[in-house]
Curated annotation (Swiss-Prot):
Belongs to the glycosyltransferase 39 family. It comes from Corynebacterium glutamicum (strain ATCC 13032 / DSM 20300 / JCM 1318 / BCRC 11384 / CCUG 27702 / LMG 3730 / NBRC 12168 / NCIMB 10025 / NRRL B-2784 / 534). This is Polyprenol-phosphate-mannose--protein mannosyltransferase. The lineage of its organism: Bacteria, Bacillati, Actinomycetota, Actinomycetes, Mycobacteriales. Disruption phenotype: Loss of protein glycosylation. It is a multi-pass membrane protein. It is found in: Cell membrane. The chain crosses the membrane at residues 38-58, 119-139, 145-165, 168-188, 237-257, 274-294, 388-408, 418-438, 441-461, 485-505. Keywords: Cell membrane, Glycosyltransferase, Membrane, Transferase, Transmembrane, Transmembrane helix. InterPro entries: GlyclTrfase_39-like, Glyco_trans_39/83, PMT_4TMC.
Length: 520
């Protein structure tokens, strides 16, 4: 009889606050089945992300904010300084560039190779969309130790409409999502490595003798976490939220390990040995990488606000007059961007037909129309249309709240640590937007939520697998529920795929897919 799969080394942990000794960290041995699993997902990822990439819209017409980012990336190609520095956004005709440059620098690589073409401005998002699936699977494998859970996470990531559409258009969000997901993976690797070091020390000495516990030494995985967080920040300022949430989580996990392994003064030990190195890796490193992403702006004499001090843009009584020319201009640029974001509120008259608020994101309640072509002649009679929506597969998004509640219950009631990082990452992408509720927002802000919803769903499926009585199919009721759910996700993905890919469909098919008025 098959058994339920635990969240490996993260399951029922009755001693989490009792100081009992934890089990040894899990070992992750790569098997032939892992190779087959990842290869299958890789093939489908490439097919779903790259098929028709250059013709996703009529003649490759830019959609939504592609109209901003595509020419900005092309500016970088045209103003290329050298291979290391790259180029700048010259700001012709579209006002202030309000996002950091990294994502557009990456898109510029595609345009440099393939020219100012749809393939050129979409190839890099497709690559990073594929890598995001692998990052999701890597986290699921690390938390579960299960090839099956990894495979489930891969299927769910393949079948989500938000991840798919975000991987096929030259927007910024898929770059942010990849770097955040990769940072979460590195954070988990760091925690598991520290667990292993303490376990080895315990086996060697029989106890952790120091009052404050040991120093962990240089932590390359924590450093890697900081690198990915810095890259996320260099795509969008919302990366700041993840720096704060992941930084606190890293310190909390260190404190927990010290307490769990019997360190007497574990709080002081954490403050003494862990906090300063964590600040270095998770705050200083991201800040340095963020500044590095602006290297072309500093290198060019024609960058926007590059000479704001001497041309009078910065007033004589400003404190920025105390700074060197380039630093003053750079700070003034950031102040201007901050003022823009602060003024982009619903109450100040900035409304948009596809505006949405965070509570609606939890159920994909207000998607975004990216492309529309109607009144197309149909062979079946009547008229047809092509529509592309940024839209979440309902069978995934409608379980967002239930799986979060399950994860919270698993952590607080069953002491299951496997859900900690996914929960923290989801909170970092959701809670800060509640504080800015009046701001103009769009559903693509929620793109960073779905990887962690998928991971929690995959972990929950792993725990359900093997539970219950055996059925005539040879599977338990729990296993049948998992198979049924995965089948439902795939069927929904196929049913809504015309809205993801922009297939020509009769009007009545389109109407049958518009289940709610808010989807229109």
């Amino acid at each position: 009889m098959s058994q339920a799969l635990p969240v490996r080394d993260q399951g029922r942990d009755q001693g989490i606050f009792a100081g009992t000794l934890p089990p040894a960290p899990p070992k992750f041995k790569w098997t032939r089945l892992d190779t087959y699993t990842w290869a299958i997902i890789a093939v489908f990822a490439l097919v779903t992300r790259f098929t028709g990439l250059s013709s996703a819209t009529a003649s490759g017409t830019p959609v939504f904010d592609e109209k901003h980012y595509v020419p900005q990336a092309w500016d970088m190609v045209r103003s290329w300084i050298n291979p290391i520095t790259g180029g700048i956004e010259s700001n012709p005709g579209y006002g202030l560039v309000v996002h950091p440059p990294l994502a557009k620098q990456l898109e510029a690589l595609g345009e440099w190779v393939f020219g100012y073409t749809p393939l050129g401005w979409r190839i890099m998002v497709a690559i990073f969309g594929t890598l995001t699936i692998f990052a999701i699977m890597a986290i699921a494998r690390r938390l579960s130790g299960s090839t099956m859970v990894t495979f489930i996470a891969g299927i769910l990531a393949l079948a989500d409409g938000v991840l798919l559409v975000s991987s096929r258009f030259g927007m910024l969000d898929i770059f942010l999502v990849f770097f955040i997901t990769a940072a979460a993976w590195a954070l988990i690797r760091d925690h598991q490595q520290m667990h292993q070091r303490l376990n080895d020390l315990l086996l060697t000495n029989g106890q952790i003798t120091k009052d404050f516990g040991p120093r962990f030494g240089f932590r390359w995985w924590r450093f890697t976490t900081g690198v990915f967080l810095g890259l996320a920040l260099s795509v969008k300022w919302s990366g700041l939220y993840y720096i704060a949430f992941f930084g606190l989580t890293s310190v909390f996990l260190d404190l927990w390990l010290r307490k769990r392994y019997g360190v007497r003064r574990y709080v002081t030990g954490t403050l003494k040995n862990d906090v300063i190195p964590a600040l270095g890796s998770l705050v200083i490193i991201p800040a340095l990488l963020y500044i590095w992403s602006w290297r072309a702006w500093f290198a060019s004499e024609t960058s926007v606000y590059r000479h704001a001090k001497t041309d009078g843009t910065i007033t004589e009584d400003s404190i920025l007059q105390l700074f060197p020319e380039s630093i003053a201009g750079w700070i003034h640029y950031h102040i201007s961007v901050l003022e823009f974001h602060g003024s982009l509120t619903t109450s100040s008259g900035h409304s948009h037909p596809w505006d949405s608020k965070p509570w609606a994101w939890l159920v994909s309640g207000r998607p975004i129309l990216y492309f529309s072509s109607t009144d197309i002649s149909c062979d079946v009679g009547g008229t047809c249309r092509r529509m592309i929506y940024l839209f979440g597969t309902p069978a995934i998004w409608w379980l967002t709240v239930p799986v979060i509640l399950w994860a919270l219950w698993s952590f607080f009631a069953r002491r299951s640590r496997g859900y900690v990082v996914p929960l923290v990452a989801f909170a970092a992408g959701f809670l800060p937007w509640l504080a800015a509720y009046d701001r103009q927002m769009y559903f693509f802000y929620a793109t960073a939520l779905v990887p962690f919803t998928i991971i929690m769903l995959a972990l929950a499926c792993g725990e359900l697998w093997g539970r219950g009585k055996m059925t005539p199919t040879g599977l338990t009721r729990g296993s049948m529920a998992v198979v049924t759910y995965i089948s439902l996700v795939v069927m929904m993905f196929l049913a809504f795929s015309p809205l993801f890919y922009g297939f020509v469909i009769p009007d009545y098919v389109y109407e049958s897919l518009m289940w709610f008025p808010s989807w229109r």
